[in-house]
Structure formats: C-alpha cells, structure tokens
Amino acid sequence: MELAVLGTGAAGRAIAARLAELGHHVSIGTRDPEATQARDDFAGWAADHPDVRPATFAAAAAAAEVVLVVTNGSASVDVLTQAGADHLEGKVVIDVSNPLDFSQGMPPTLFVKDTDSLAEQIQRAFPAARVVKTLNTMNNEVMVHPELLPDPGSVFVSGDDAAAKETATGLLTELGHTDIIDLGDLSSARGAEMLLPIWVRLMGVMGTARFNFKIVR
C-alpha cells in the first residue's frame, strides 16, 4: 500500500520505518525535505531507512492511498492544508496527533476538549477526507511494537466511515495490535484525546513512556 506519514518527529519516524518494514511503500512528509535531511537526527535515521522517501507534504499525500497525521496537534490542520485538500479527497486520513498545549509548560493542557476534538476539526476542515482517530493514547514505541509490553493493551478507533475504520484496523493488526476497540463515530475521539492528561501524569509517576491502557472485560 502507498502510505504517507506526515511528520518527521520521533513518532512519525517510528511509524514510517515500521510500515516500510512491513512491506508498504512509505513517504515521510515535511515542509522542506532538503532542510529536514540536513538535520543530524533525521539524516542518521534516513541513512538507516533508505526505503522511506522524504517528500513535501503535498507530494507525499498526492502519492498515497492512506495519509497518517503524526504531527504536533497544533500544526495538524496547517500541515494537511499544505498537503492539499485535493490530495486528501476520498482518502483515509489517520489522525495520530493530540491537541496538547505546552504554552504554560508541563504538564500540558488540551486546546480542544469535551464538546469537540482535534479529529473532528480535521474532518470539518477536509470534509472529503475520511478521518479515523487511533494510536494517540500510547508512546511511539508501543504504537509500532506493542509486543514490547507483557500485555500490549488496548488501542481505540474512532471514525464516521466504516470502510476507513476497516483500513485503519488492518494497519493496526499489521503493527501487532490485537485488542482493537471501535469506539464509534468520530465524536468518540474526544474521549481518546482526553486520556492524554492522565497519560502524561502516568509517564511522570512511572518514569517511563513504555506502557499502555488496557480495557479489562
């Protein structure tokens, strides 16, 4: 499958690398590929993953069947605008980002909550896209290697389009997730995003980001 991962931070790089390892054709989108490739952290990673193609947001999205948004939440809509609404039309857009506000330091707050979600804002901004929210409730290591945990835990999926959620669920299964919980329509992403404040607190208390939430039935 042709996939575009928008975002070159730790999570974007982890997801892009793992999906390429699984046999997908992956582009990693950035505002300025030349400047990104000049960064020491990215250059070293890119040398280890030559099968992942750096591209502009627009070029990555244009070539993709599925677009994954793995950016700082405050930049998500802007990044997708640069990718181009015409390049998102009819495509599955998997939103992994979170509406975290670090303007007052740590711990962060949420810049959208309760009656809205970042995923819904993305859907409203790009109504022809098929937005699915998932993977936002865990660290990037656990996103791509859930087997690192003795019990991988649960992963949540929200979206209005059943076929788009099926596509996202297929990718989650490839990544090794087994407890995939469909929360319902895209408004259910509000709850998934609101887990982040407690996730951040847990990380501080436990001194590690290598954990996950688990729904016990």
Question: Which residues does each PLM region occupy?
Answer:
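Glycine-rich beta-alpha junction loops
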Residues: A75, S97-L100, M138-N139, D161, ...
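NAD(P)+-binding Rossmann beta1-loop-alpha1 motif at the extreme N-terminus of oxidoreductases
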Residues: M1-G44
